[in-house]
Swiss-Prot record:
<feature type="domain" description="Protein kinase">
    <location>
        <begin position="584"/>
        <end position="918"/>
    </location>
</feature>
<feature type="modified residue" description="Phosphotyrosine; by autocatalysis">
    <location>
        <position position="813"/>
    </location>
</feature>
<dbReference type="InterPro" id="IPR007110">
    <property type="entry name" value="Ig-like_dom"/>
</dbReference>
<dbReference type="GO" id="GO:0043235">
    <property type="term" value="C:receptor complex"/>
</dbReference>
<feature type="modified residue" description="Phosphotyrosine; by autocatalysis">
    <location>
        <position position="929"/>
    </location>
</feature>
<dbReference type="InterPro" id="IPR000719">
    <property type="entry name" value="Prot_kinase_dom"/>
</dbReference>
<dbReference type="GO" id="GO:0005011">
    <property type="term" value="F:macrophage colony-stimulating factor receptor activity"/>
</dbReference>
<keyword id="KW-0732">Signal</keyword>
<keyword id="KW-0829">Tyrosine-protein kinase</keyword>
<comment type="function">
    <text>Tyrosine-protein kinase that acts as a cell-surface receptor for CSF1 and plays an essential role in the regulation of survival, proliferation and differentiation of hematopoietic precursor cells, especially mononuclear phagocytes, such as macrophages and monocytes. Plays an important role in innate immunity and in inflammatory processes. Plays an important role in the regulation of osteoclast proliferation and differentiation, the regulation of bone resorption, and is required for normal bone development.</text>
</comment>
<keyword id="KW-0067">ATP-binding</keyword>
<feature type="compositionally biased region" description="Basic and acidic residues">
    <location>
        <begin position="944"/>
        <end position="958"/>
    </location>
</feature>
<keyword id="KW-1003">Cell membrane</keyword>
<keyword id="KW-0393">Immunoglobulin domain</keyword>
<dbReference type="GO" id="GO:0019838">
    <property type="term" value="F:growth factor binding"/>
</dbReference>
<keyword id="KW-0808">Transferase</keyword>
<feature type="glycosylation site" description="N-linked (GlcNAc...) asparagine">
    <location>
        <position position="289"/>
    </location>
</feature>
Length: 975
C-alpha cells in the first residue's frame, strides 16, 4: 500500500497537469467518503491528505500541528496514537504552494468519542469577556455523533434570556449573536444521548457595555496667571468606565513641558487618570490656550484653560455698580432710604492676602485663584452713611485701593424765622442745593402757593437764594432774606424750598397770634413723644437680648397625653457636691458665649484621694450676666446632679455655690468637640481610606506635629491642647504627672490616625449616652456633633454648652420666631409644631450620624434655611449617603429620619445595630484607646480597673430604687 500511494499521486499529478482537483483525505488508510468520521476510545487517529501539489492541514487547535508529518510525494499526515476528546474537530486540507488553487480544499469532521465527556470545552474559553454587540461562538464540541438536540440554557436551569439569539452548529458549537449586558450569566451547552441530557462545563459570559459617552474631563481653573520664571502645574482630572481611553494635551507653549499621569481604579466600572502638565519656568511666549483631551470609543471630550504670563505682580481694581448707577463712575448719588451696593472686581497676582473696606459695614467676598469680587451692602441708607468708601487690597508683592464717593439726595427742609418787624429769613438744607421762592397772601392761610385759596398771591423773585455752607458730604445750607411791606391786614408769608428730590415750605403770619406759646407747647409735646418712643424702643431691645436657656428637659409625670416637666429650679441641690474654692486653680479660657465661659482648671483633692490633682473644666458666668442666667446655671447644675454618672456624658464632678460666683466643675475633654476633631482628621482619614501611595512620600504634609496649634472656635466649647500627658479624668500623684510630662506628646490619642472603627465607636458611644438620658426621662433638644466632646482616649461624651456658646453669632442657629434654633438638626414636629420628644432627639441623632460619616460637613450642604428648605423637610426630603458611611449606617440614618416619630428606632435599638457592625462585642472590650499610660503597662498595672470617682449623689443613696422610665412612645413639650 505504501508503494502504491506515490504511484497513485504521480498518476494524479500527470493527469491534472491541465486542471487541479480537490485534495483527497484518507482516514486510517481509507479514502473518506463522508464529512464525518468517528474515532473509538482507545484507537489511533491517522489522517492523510494528498493532491496535485504540496498540501497542508488546518487544525482546530494550533498545538495539534506538532502531530503533523510530511510523507513522500505531495502527502501530509496527522498521526495521534491515543487521541483524546481534545482532538474532536474539523480538519481541513488545502494546497499550500499555489495561491490560485487555495480555494480547492477538502475537510472532514472527526469525533473522538469519550464516554465520560459528551462535550469537549477548553478551560481557557470558560470565562468569556466580550464587548456589547459582538458575536461569540461557544466552543461546545460534541464528541459523540449520536448526540441530538444540541442547545443552550443557564447554569441554574432556567432558559436563556428571551432577547438572546443564537445558532447551533454541530461541528463548531453555539454562536450567540449581538451580545448584550443583560446576557451576563453562567451558561451550559446541552445535548441528549440515548434520551439522557448531558451538559458541558459552565461558560461565564461577561459583556462589557459599549461606551455611549466620551470620558469625563475637568480642569480646576478657567485661567492661570504666572509671573515670568514661575512654575506652572495644571491638573486634569478624568475618568472613564473602563481602561480603554487615553488623555492627551494640546498647548501652544514654547517652554519645555513635562506630563505625568497617575492612574487609579475606583471599582470595576471606573478608571481615574490624573494627568499633570508642568512647566518649570514659564515665559511670556507661553501665554495661550491649553486643552486637556480625553478620548474613548464613544468620542472625544476636552476641557480648556488659559495661561497668562505677566512680567510683574499686579493688582487691578474696577468699580462694579448696578446699571443705573454705572454711568456715575466713582461718584455715586442716591436717594435717602434706598439700598446701595458697592462692588469691586479685583484682578491680582499673586493672590491678595488682605482686603478690607474703610467702613464699619461688613463686606462679603467671593474669590477664584486671582479674580475676586468684593461687595458692600448698604441697606436703607441715611444721611450719616454718605461719604468716602475705600476698598483696600494687598498681596505679598503689590497693593492697591479704590474709593467711591457716595452722596445722598436729600429733600429740602425749609424753616422761616422772624428777624425783626420787617425782615424774615428762610433757611433750607438739602442736596442738591435747594432754591428758595417767597409767596405772600392776605389772611391766615396754610399755604400761599396754590390757587385753592382763591386769594391773590405775589411772587417775589428779588429775594435771592444765597449758599451759606457746603460740606464735602452732606446737605447744602442756603438762605434767603425777605422784607415784609407794611400792611393793615393780617398777612401770611410762605417760604418754598425745592430741588430735584422734593419741595418743602414753611409759613409765617405777620400779625402776632392771640394764642400765646402755641408753638412752644407743640414743640414740647413733640419732644415728649420722641422721648417716649425712644424709651419703648430701648425696652424692646432689652427684651430681645439673648437669654440662656438650658436645652435639656426632665419629665416629671405623665397623665394620658398631658406631660408635666420638672422645673429645674425646684430640683434639690445636694450639698455634698460642694468643693472649696481655694482648692481650684483656674487656667485658660476654653470657650465663651454671650453670658458665660468655660475655663480649664486644676482641682486639688477632688475625689476620695485628698492628695490627688485633677484637670477639670469649670463653667461660670461673665460679669454682664443677668439674674436669669444665674438661675439657668444653677438649673444646669441641678439637672446634672439629678442625672447621675455615665461614661458617655460629660459628668458633674463638683460645684462652688457659696462665697462667690457659681462654678460648675465637670470632666475635662482635651480633644475638644467632635465636629472640629473630625474636620482636623479629615485629610489623613481620606488618604488612609483611599490608600493613596503619595501619603508615604508626603507624610510630612499630613502627620500631626506634637506642638501643632489648635484653633478655638467661639462656639466649640472646650477645645485645646495640653503640654502634659495628664491622665484623663483620673486622680494622679504630682510625681506621676511630672514623669508622664516628659513623654512625647505624640503618644496622645489625638494624634492617632482616624479610621472607620473610630467613626462607628463615636456613633455607638453617643447613642449609649442618649439612651442613658432617655432612661433618666431627659430630652436633650440639641443633639449635634458640636455638643459632643472627646477625651484624650477618644471617648465621646454628650454635653450642652449653653452659656458657653454664642448662638447669636453661630450660623447653625437660625432665627425662628423669637428664638434662635438649630433648625437643620431639628425634627419636623419640633420645627413646625414645637414638639420635643425622645423621638425628636432620634431625628437629630440621624443628622449627627451624617456629620460623623461626612467628616464634619454641615448638614444639607449648600441649602439655605428658607421656605424651600421647610417644604422639603415637610415632604420627607432626606440627605444622600455620606462619603464614608456604610450602607448599614445610612439605613440607620433613614430610619431616624422617618416622618412618623413613633416609627423611629429607640437609642437602645440603634446601639445594638451599631454594636453588631463592630463585631457584637461589649463596648468596653471594643475600646482600644484604654485609659492607661505606657508606664502602667510596663509596670503591670494595665490590668487593674481604674478607680472611678463616684459623685456624692451616688453615695448618698438619693435613688434607692430605679423608677420606671416615663419615656414611652410620645412625650411632648409644647411651646
Amino acid at each position: 500500500m505504501q508503494s502504491f500511494l506515490p504511484l497513485l499521486m504521480g498518476i494524479m499529478a500527470s493527469a491534472s497537469s491541465v486542471e487541479w482537483r480537490h485534495p483527497v483525505i484518507w482516514f486510517n488508510s481509507k479514502v473518506v467518503q463522508s464529512s464525518e468520521v468517528v474515532v473509538k476510545p482507545g484507537t489511533s487517529l491517522e489522517l492523510k491528505c494528498g493532491g496535485d501539489g504540496p498540501v497542508n492541514w488546518q487544525t482546530r487547535l494550533p498545538k495539534h500541528k506538532r502531530y503533523m508529518s510530511r510523507s513522500p510525494g505531495n502527502l501530509r499526515t496527522i498521526r495521534v496514537a491515543r487521541p483524546t476528546a481534545e482532538f474532536t474537530g474539523t480538519y481541513k486540507c488545502f494546497y499550500s504552494a499555489w495561491a490560485q488553487h487555495r480555494h480547492l480544499t477538502s475537510s472532514v469532521h472527526v469525533y473522538v468519542k469519550d464516554p465520560n465527556r459528551v462535550f469537549w470545552t477548553s478551560s481557557t474559553s470558560l470565562r468569556v469577556v466580550r464587548k456589547e454587540g459582538e458575536d461569540y461562538l461557544l466552543p461546545c464540541l460534541l464528541t459523540d455523533p449520536e448526540a441530538t438536540d444540541l442547545g443552550l440554557r443557564m447554569d441554574n436551569g432556567t432558559t436563556v434570556p428571551p432577547e438572546m439569539n443564537y445558532t447551533v452548529y454541530r461541528h463548531r458549537g453555539i454562536l450567540i449573536r449581538s451580545l448584550q449586558p443583560s446576557f451576563n450569566a453562567d451558561y451550559v451547552c446541552t445535548a441528549k444521548v440515548k434520551g439522557v441530557e448531558k451538559t458541558s462545563k459552565t461558560f461565564s459570559i461577561n459583556v462589557i457595555q459599549k461606551l455611549r459617552f466620551p470620558p469625563y474631563v475637568f480642569l480646576e481653573m478657567d485661567e492661570y496667571v504666572r509671573i515670568v520664571g514661575e512654575e506652572l502645574q495644571i491638573r486634569c482630572m478624568t475618568h472613564n468606565p473602563n481602561f480603554n481611553y487615553n488623555v492627551t494635551w494640546n498647548y501652544t507653549t514654547k517652554s519645555r513641558v513635562t506630563i505625568e499621569e497617575r492612574v487609579r481604579s475606583s471599582g470595576e466600572n471606573r478608571l481615574d487618570i490624573q494627568s499633570i502638565l508642568t512647566i518649570s519656568a514659564v515665559d511670556l511666549a507661553d501665554t495661550g490656550n491649553i486643552s486637556c483631551i480625553g478620548t474613548n470609543e464613544a468620542g472625544v471630550n476636552s476641557s480648556n484653560t488659559y495661561l497668562l504670563v505677566v512680567e510683574k505682580p499686579y493688582i487691578r481694581l474696577w468699580p462694579q455698580l448696578i446699571p443705573k448707577l454705572a454711568s456715575q463712575g466713582l461718584s455715586v448719588e442716591v436717594n435717602e432710604g434706598e439700598d446701595l451696593e458697592l462692588g469691586v472686581m479685583v484682578e491680582a497676582y499673586p493672590q491678595i492676602t488682605d482686603h478690607r473696606w474703610h467702613t464699619p459695614t461688613s463686606p462679603s467676598t467671593s474669590m477664584q485663584e486671582h479674580i475676586y469680587h468684593a461687595r458692600l451692602q448698604l441697606k436703607r441708607m441715611n444721611a450719616q452713611e454718605q461719604g468716602q468708601y475705600t476698598f483696600y487690597a494687598k498681596s505679598n508683592l503689590a497693593n492697591g485701593s479704590i474709593s467711591f464717593h457716595v452722596k445722598m439726595y436729600q429733600k429740602p427742609i425749609a424753616v422761616v424765622r422772624w428777624e425783626n418787624i420787617t425782615t424774615l429769613t428762610c433757611t433750607s438744607f438739602g442736596y442738591p442745593a435747594p432754591q428758595i421762592i417767597w409767596y405772600q397772601c392776605s389772611g391766615i392761610r396754610p399755604t400761599c402757593n396754590g390757587n385753592n385759596t382763591g386769594l391773590p398771591k405775589q411772587n417775589h423773585p428779588q429775594a435771592l437764594t444765597v449758599e451759606v455752607q457746603r460740606e464735602e458730604y452732606g446737605a447744602v445750607e442756603v438762605e434767603s432774606v425777605f422784607t415784609v411791606g407794611l400792611s393793615n391786614h393780617r398777612m401770611t408769608v410762605e417760604c418754598v424750598a425745592f430741588n430735584l428730590v422734593g419741595v418743602s415750605s414753611d409759613t409765617f403770619t405777620v400779625e402776632v397770634s392771640d394764642k400765646l406759646f402755641t408753638s412752644t407747647l407743640i414743640g414740647a409735646a413733640g419732644v415728649l413723644a420722641i422721648f417716649l418712643l425712644l424709651l419703648v424702643f430701648l425696652l424692646y431691645k432689652y427684651k430681645q437680648k439673648p437669654r440662656f436657656e438650658i436645652r435639656w428637659k426632665i419629665i416629671e409625670a405623665r397623665e394620658g397625653n398631658n406631660y408635666t416637666f420638672i422645673d429645674p429650679t425646684q430640683l434639690p441641690y445636694n450639698e455634698k457636691w460642694e468643693f472649696p474654692r481655694d482648692k481650684l486653680k483656674l487656667g485658660k479660657v476654653l470657650g465663651a458665649g454671650a453670658f458665660g465661659k468655660v475655663v480649664e482648671a486644676t482641682a486639688f483633692g477632688l475625689g476620695e484621694d485628698k492628695d490627688n490633682t485633677l484637670r477639670v473644666a469649670v463653667k461660670m458666668l461673665k460679669a454682664n450676666a443677668h439674674s436669669d442666667e444665674r438661675e439657668a446655671l444653677m438649673s444646669e447644675l441641678k439637672i446634672l446632679s439629678h442625672l447621675g454618672h455615665h461614661q458617655n456624658i460629660v459628668n458633674l464632678l463638683g460645684a462652688c455655690t457659696y462665697g462667690g460666683p457659681v462654678l460648675v466643675i465637670t470632666e475635662y475633654c482635651s480633644l475638644g468637640d467632635l465636629l472640629n476633631f473630625l474636620r482636623q482628621k479629615a485629610e489623613t482619614f481620606v488618604n488612609l481610606v483611599m490608600n493613596i501611595p503619595e501619603i508615604m512620600e508626603n507624610s510630612n504634609d499630613y502627620k500631626n506635629i506634637c506642638n501643632q496649634k489648635w484653633y478655638i472656635r467661639s462656639d466649640s466649647g472646650i477645645s485645646s491642647t495640653s503640654s502634659s500627658t495628664y491622665l484623663e479624668m483620673r486622680p494622679s500623684q504630682q510625681s506621676h504627672i511630672e514623669a508622664s510630662g516628659r513623654k512625647s506628646l505624640c503618644e496622645d490619642n489625638g494624634d492617632w490616625p482616624l479610621d472607620i472603627d473610630d467613626l462607628l465607636r463615636f456613633s455607638l458611644q453617643v447613642a449609649q449616652g442618649l439612651d442613658f438620658l432617655a432612661s433618666r426621662n431627659c430630652i436633650h433638644r440639641d443633639v449635634a456633633a458640636r455638643n459632643v466632646l472627646l477625651t484624650d482616649k477618644r471617648v465621646a461624651k454628650i454635653c450642652d454648652f449653653g452659656l458657653a456658646r454664642d448662638i447669636m453669632n453661630d450660623s447653625n442657629y437660625v432665627v425662628k420666631g423669637n428664638a434662635r434654633l438649630p433648625v437643620k438638626w431639628m425634627a419636623p414636629e419640633s420645627i413646625f409644631d414645637c414638639v420635643y420628644t425622645v423621638q425628636s432627639d432620634v431625628w437629630s441623632y440621624g443628622i449627627l450620624l451624617w456629620e460623623i460619616f461626612s467628616l464634619g460637613k454641615s448638614p444639607y450642604p449648600s441649602m439655605a434655611v428658607d421656605s424651600r428648605f421647610y417644604k422639603m423637610v415637610k415632604r420627607g426630603y432626606q440627605m444622600s449617603q455620606p462619603d464614608f458611611a456604610l450602607p448599614e449606617i445610612y439605613m440607620i440614618m433613614k430610619m431616624c429620619w422617618n416622618l412618623e416619630p413613633t416609627e423611629r428606632p429607640t437609642f437602645s435599638m440603634i446601639s445594638q445595630m451599631i454594636n453588631r457592625l463592630l463585631g457584637g462585642q461589649d463596648e468596653q472590650e471594643k475600646l482600644i484607646y484604654r485609659n492607661v499610660q505606657p508606664e502602667q503597662v510596663a509596670e503591670g498595672e494595665a490590668c487593674d480597673e481604674p478607680k472611678r470617682y463616684d459623685p456624692p449623689c451616688e453615695r448618698s443613696c438619693d435613688h434607692e430604687e430605679e423608677e420606671e422610665p416615663l419615656m414611652k412612645t410620645n412625650n411632648y413639650q409644647f411651646c
